[in-house]
């Protein structure tokens, strides 16, 4: 059986005045005094529902049709006709309605036909995609993911599947989730009284990865242009609208490239995926514009049509110190910028995307290339109006002696990075890359204010439901 989607029907891909069968869920039911019921059906394939007009002549009209409520699943067969009413081009004159599943108790069904708060929907994550906003977020998220793959494929990049379990700390921050099969009630100890991870499953300490970057660099040094796109994990106790403990990252890596090359790729990719979502999901984007953020379409078009500003960190500090604005966190050279500083630069000073680059080495990771001044590294963050940092990247340190010095400075064990150091010992090359936080991208494209609302099942401190 070939299942027909509502999006194809509404797009005019089926002939009118002929029989058609669709499947879906009831969004609303409205009954007229003339003995006709109007069913709004949706199947998630697009934002809009299709109307089915059901006459009371059907054998199961009173036993089934009049009992249909929001959320019931049905199979409807009927004649596809042009709709005389406003709002949609087609409707179905039903000749058969088969109920596939009733809602057990309509009075307690959490997704009743009314508007719910974002916070309530977060608590009902297993039912959230049934709502207008949940479905729209999901379709836009899918569109953006497909666009990322399509863009990088068109540029000759290979998608690499990097491991989720690692023995390395890519960021050197130590905020990692441990992976262990040891008995927590009876931990093995070594002669020093410390936990003996030699007895663990992998024979060493292992963690959920904070980034696929180190692993994907190995393939970059063989295939030249690669990327990874998958889940990453941070055991960071941050309860903000911009942080998750589990989130997805897009991480391209380019051989024979410097920081400017990575910034160029990032800018081109952002413009490509935003253009794709505007072209491919106009129904969902119209909903976000109307109900969520009335500036979202202008914001995306602005990114598409604006050249990104390139700004050194040192110059940014000068701007922030002299702008006359009172920040909650004061700035000085050497401190990491907060969201308020990033948003001031992107939203007020430049009113557009900013590539902030060449940061102090002490606030960045060990693998970032040390600049000739000995004080800064070739790192960048892309700041976007409305959200702040959306991309972080760098030119990687390809010189073995400098890499070793940076590992030592940050108190990391060189022995844990032997394979990573091999890349610098066997045909080292300049290479660069960046990481795009995918949930931040989805939030930016939809106008949603919290990344917890753009991932199916958010994982945050004290929350791992579903």
From Swiss-Prot:
Localisation: Cytoplasm
GO BP annotations listed: asparaginyl-tRNA aminoacylation
InterPro entries membership: Aa-tRNA-synt_II, aa-tRNA-synth_II, aa-tRNA-synth_II/BPL/LPL, Asn-tRNA-ligase, Asp/Asn-tRNA-synth_IIb, NA-bd_OB-fold, NA-bd_OB_tRNA
GO cellular component labels: cytoplasm
Record CDD domains: AsxRS_core, EcAsnRS_like_N
PROSITE patterns for the chain: AA_TRNA_LIGASE_II (PS50862)
GO molecular function: asparagine-tRNA ligase activity; ATP binding; nucleic acid binding
Subcellular location, principal: cytoplasm
Entry EC number(s): 6.1.1.22
Assigned keywords, A-Z: Aminoacyl-tRNA synthetase, ATP-binding, Cytoplasm, Ligase, Nucleotide-binding, Protein biosynthesis
Transmembrane intervals: none
Disulfide bonds: none
SUPFAM superfamilies: Class II aaRS and biotin synthetases, Nucleic acid-binding proteins
Top-level taxon: Bacteria
Reactions the enzyme catalyzes: tRNA(Asn) + L-asparagine + ATP = L-asparaginyl-tRNA(Asn) + AMP + diphosphate + H(+)
Subunit structure: Homodimer.
Family, as annotated: Belongs to the class-II aminoacyl-tRNA synthetase family.
Protein name as it appears in the record: Asparagine--tRNA ligase
Source organism of the structure: Colwellia psychrerythraea (strain 34H / ATCC BAA-681)
Gene: asnS
